[in-house]
Amino acid sequence: MVKAVAVLAGTDVKGTIFFSQEGDGPTTVTGSISGLKPGLHGFHVHALGDTTNGCMSTGPHFNPVGKEHGAPEDEDRHAGDLGNVTAGEDGVVNVNITDSQIPLAGPHSIIGRAVVVHADPDDLGKGGHELSKSTGNAGGRVACGIIGLQG
């Protein structure tokens, strides 16, 4: 079992996200995020583990095979497209995602990359906005953290 963790930090938003993968199976993503406005928020793995300029320096969505942005269940999607997480009235998200395109080992490993939560909902590439096919038009990056190996 490979395990990883990302501590999310933003101006008002914070959280801890855990990743685990057994063998070649899917990766399970769990944890919680607080300080969000109620509703949907885009949630993605970004290509770079660089936070020197805050969340802006984490680069685009992790996309090792050059696809367009989409929903987690779409065949045509960035590997890092994890869809939306939902914050309750208290601004808290409890994350529980299982995904097969974000491995913790191998050539497309997400270790050392960043996980980012966005201000707005991800339209899953279906919104018709000029940014729909690249970012899901999910708005600003309100918190991010670098995915690191865990013992």
UniProtKB/Swiss-Prot annotation:
GO biological process: removal of superoxide radicals
Disulfide bonds: C55-C144
Source species, domain of life: Eukaryota
GO CC term, one of those recorded: cytoplasm
Coiled coil location: none
Cofactor binding annotation: Binds 1 copper ion per subunit.
Catalytic reaction list: 2 superoxide + 2 H(+) = H2O2 + O2
Pfam families to which the protein is assigned, alphabetical: Sod_Cu (PF00080)
Cofactor: Cu cation; Zn(2+)
Keywords (A to Z) from UniProt: Antioxidant, Copper, Cytoplasm, Disulfide bond, Metal-binding, Oxidoreductase, Zinc
Subcellular location(s) of the protein: Cytoplasm
Subunit relationships: Homodimer.
Protein name: Superoxide dismutase [Cu-Zn] 2
Gene behind this protein: SODCC.1
